[in-house]
Amino acid sequence: MQHFRDKIVVVKYGGNAMVDDDLKAAFAADMVFLRTVGAKPVVVHGGGPQISEMLNRVGLQGEFKGGFRVTTPEVMDIVRMVLFGQVGRDLVGLINSHGPYAVGTSGEDAGLFTAQKRMVNIDGVPTDIGLVGDIINVDASSLMDIIEAGRIPVVSTIAPGEDGQIYNINADTAAGALAAAIGAERLLVLTNVEGLYTDWPDKSSLVSKIKATELEAILPGLDSGMIPKMESCLNAVRGGVSAAHVIDGRIAHSVLLELLTMGGIGTMVLPDVFDRENYPEGTVFRKDDKDGEL
């Protein structure tokens, strides 16, 4: 636990953890716990289920291509409203039920993110998916002010482009870019599965640890929904983050279980070369490791 004192931990909040009331409450409590013991949590959130629900309510068709939401201007209006006005506010409220910790912000605020339009490669063909962006710059000075004030930033993933357009940023992508930019110690990505399956749906293909080069080699063949998550982990680790984790958000207190228990509960992505002395005792040794293996 002492290992994480004064270190930034970026958590991408999503999946069942953001729709089940008990899991939402447990997640908020975990963020406050991390802050109380001296870590510096930063939450980056998506809002897929809530966006889909609102699109249905207003009669707009939602579509996904290559794991990304196709974002027309009409869909973008809903995305912006739901992410910052609903999901972000709800999480800020849950965290602040424990005390005045959380501050809501977005990629639009104080130039945190700058984006450019993203094309998605589907079956080898670059495909336009609308107002979906990639982050090309992170200016975290205002975010660091929030962190250093002892607060927990809750970041909505919408961002302006240099063309003046507002883009929908995949929250997994944003979390990885932010973690690397602010020198985070760890990135954790909450999902609705136990971790990384190298050959989904074969349950025996679940791995508890993988190095960056190994992940890069299998990335194109992964299930489409996992590609943005694992790409985010890869980019974070390549950007200097000590480790990135994909964990099962359906388990209450999954963040603490992954960070603070022997062997963790999910999949840990590590740099190709690492010194286990720089990691808390036992946490690099994972569930499916052989005796003596790093």
Curated annotation (Swiss-Prot):
One matching Pfam family: AA_kinase
Q: What organism does the record attribute this protein to?
A: Corynebacterium glutamicum (strain ATCC 13032 / DSM 20300 / JCM 1318 / BCRC 11384 / CCUG 27702 / LMG 3730 / NBRC 12168 / NCIMB 10025 / NRRL B-2784 / 534)
User: Where does the UniProt annotation place the signal sequence?
Assistant: none
Q: Which InterPro entries match?
A: AceGlu_kinase-like_sf, AcgluKinase_fam, ArgB, Asp/Glu/Uridylate_kinase, Glu/AcGlu_kinase, NAGK-C
Coiled-coil region(s) at which residues?
A: none
State the Gene Ontology BP annotations: arginine biosynthetic process via ornithine; L-arginine biosynthetic process
Compartments where found: Cytoplasm
Task: Provide the gene name from the record.
Answer: argB
Q: What does the UniProt record say this protein does? A: Catalyzes the ATP-dependent phosphorylation of N-acetyl-L-glutamate.
> Site: Transition state stabilizer. Where?
K12, K229
Which reaction(s) does its UniProt entry say it catalyses? N-acetyl-L-glutamate + ATP = N-acetyl-L-glutamyl 5-phosphate + ADP
Q: In which pathway does it act?
A: Amino-acid biosynthesis; L-arginine biosynthesis; N(2)-acetyl-L-ornithine from L-glutamate: step 2/4
CDD domains assigned to the protein according to its UniProt record, in alphabetical order: AAK_NAGK-C
Major localization class? cytoplasm
Q: What is the lineage of its organism?
A: Bacteria, Bacillati, Actinomycetota, Actinomycetes, Mycobacteriales
This chain belongs to which protein, by name?
Answer: Acetylglutamate kinase
Provide the Gene Ontology terms for cellular component: cytoplasm
Q: EC no.?
A: 2.7.2.8
Q: Provide the residue positions that the database annotates as binding substrate.
A: G47, G48, R69, N168
Query: A single GO molecular function, which one?
Result: ATP binding
Keywords from the UniProt entry? Amino-acid biosynthesis, Arginine biosynthesis, ATP-binding, Cytoplasm, Kinase, Nucleotide-binding, Transferase
Can you tell me which family this protein belongs to?
Belongs to the acetylglutamate kinase family. ArgB subfamily.
